[in-house]
Amino acid sequence: MPIKSFKPVTPSRRNMTSLDYSVLTTDRPEKSLIKTRKKHAGRNNQGVITTRHKGGGHKVKYRIIDFKRNKDNIIGKIATIEYDPNRNAFICLVNYVDGEKRYILAPKTIKVGMQIVSAEKTDIKVGNCMKLKNIPEGTVLHNLELRPGKGGQLARSAGSSVQFLGKDEDGKYVTIRLTSGEVRKVLGECRATVGEVGNEDYALVNWGKAGRNRWRGIRPTVRGSAMNPNDHPHGGGEGKAPVGRKAPMTPWGKKALGVKTRNKKKASTKLIVRRRTK
């Protein structure tokens, strides 16, 4: 999908780019599949900030997405391709022959009128969903489960995918390679959808001005060196002062660079064949 640029009529428009939304077929979502989304602004149930730089943003309705793809052996037809304000991937509305409607993530190359199906084993066709143990080697996948029946958790953002590498001798586990370069094992009973997620040019968008990020609910990221010493380890000093420590620090006084952040006690560590590449 092409990237749209703008004439520099204002300073913020000079380098600003946008996605070309001509691929979308409607701007009206299916009413039965939307609900109100409450804002949390990065706070938990006690009001404590757990994720910084979140808050504000335009009011949006949540689209109920079918990540489980558990409607087996019933053919569905792609009715629309739509924008979803809650994610960077597009979504498409699927009309099943039994009358039910569901939203799914829109894979790359999907078109209105195409037919898709979910089953234990089916054709290797973009949009079809099946169990990993029945997928041939080398297949590109998205919306991949980590636990059978829980719903897709991996490769759900725009342009992302995982590659199917092979199966164990006993068939219990399969091996996949993630976009990060990590190679890991997943249960063969888990499901995944064929193809990669669409809207792959999303990463190339230049937002142009701070205000566009505010519309998205993203607040400013303040440099530690611009803070006071009681707010950040880099803060304080006269004028532009250096860090003043051996290494850059996080706001909580831990080393910011080159430190492994994964919990060593995680049970799934034994399933990782090769760590992600930096």
Curated annotation (Swiss-Prot):
SUPFAM superfamilies named among the record's database cross-references:
Nucleic acid-binding proteins (SSF50249), Translation proteins SH3-like domain (SSF50104)
GO BP annotations of the record are:
cytoplasmic translation
Q: Which InterPro entries match?
A: NA-bd_OB-fold, Rib_uL2_dom2, Ribosomal_uL2, Ribosomal_uL2_bac/org-type, Ribosomal_uL2_C, Ribosomal_uL2_CS, Ribosomal_uL2_dom3, Ribosomal_uL2_RNA-bd_dom
Give the keywords, sorted. Ribonucleoprotein, Ribosomal protein, RNA-binding, rRNA-binding
**Function as written in the Swiss-Prot or TrEMBL entry:** One of the primary rRNA binding proteins. Required for association of the 30S and 50S subunits to form the 70S ribosome, for tRNA binding and peptide bond formation. It has been suggested to have peptidyltransferase activity; this is somewhat controversial. Makes several contacts with the 16S rRNA in the 70S ribosome.
Q: Where is this region: Disordered?
A: 223-278
Q: Which gene encodes it?
A: rplB
The answer, when asked if Lipid metabolism is one of the entry's keywords, is no
Q: Which GO terms describe its cellular component?
A: large ribosomal subunit
Q: Superkingdom, according to UniProt?
A: Bacteria
> Which Gene Ontology molecular-function terms are recorded?
rRNA binding; structural constituent of ribosome; transferase activity
Q: Which family does it belong to?
A: Belongs to the universal ribosomal protein uL2 family.
Does tRNA processing appear among the keywords?
no
* Self-association state and partner proteins as the record states: Part of the 50S ribosomal subunit. Forms a bridge to the 30S subunit in the 70S ribosome.
Compositionally biased spans, kind Basic residues: 261-278
This one is known as Large ribosomal subunit protein uL2
